[in-house]
Swiss-Prot record:
Glycans are attached at residues 41, 109. The lineage of its organism: Eukaryota, Metazoa, Spiralia, Lophotrochozoa, Mollusca. Keywords: Glycoprotein, Secreted, Signal. It comes from Haliotis asinina. This is Uncharacterized protein 6. The keyword Signal applies.
Amino acid sequence: MGYFPYLAVFVCLLASGDAQWKGLRGSTKASWVRVVSPTLNVTQEAYIWDADSGISFISRSKLLTGTSINRNRAYTDYNQPKIAIKFRKDVGRTCILLDVASALIGTFNETSTNLQALTVLDTTEEKSYQSVGTVLSATSQSAFDLQHPFIQKKCSDRNYNYLATTELTAGAAPPPASDKFTVFTTWGKVHLYILQSTGLVITTTTEAP
């Protein structure tokens, strides 16, 4: 990972309702900020197709050159209706965080030191994001913001909510009645399972490159 010594402490997916507009016929064009590091933020764009809610990335920012974070239209696992629905309807509401550090995989909540520790882990390892079940209280969000102004700048100033998460046990079967959504990162894949009953992602598992 020496090619980019400050590769993300976090990658927060921030979909902005102000940045959504109609694109190609039969689609909605969405734009969001990807936080690669405290000093590198890039805008990514995609078309969300009305027919099946499939997502097609438009281009990869030149700022990502050399980081191995590539745009690839073959990323078909992104074509999950519930994720597309979140892009469309939940924008401006949620800053999505995911515990992916090997030393910290497990359950954490709004008062967990693990969640806060994710911001100071090995900066050569990209972190990713996840939609989950429990919104942090206003008090916890405020405390978290004060301790981590980098995340606060990209999330709270837009009135996002931070969310807690749980981890799928290694080797465990995917939860029933769920949709699989794969996030591609520099260190491998993160598989998220979106519960059809609620639309929330409460479990995840990782896979090496």
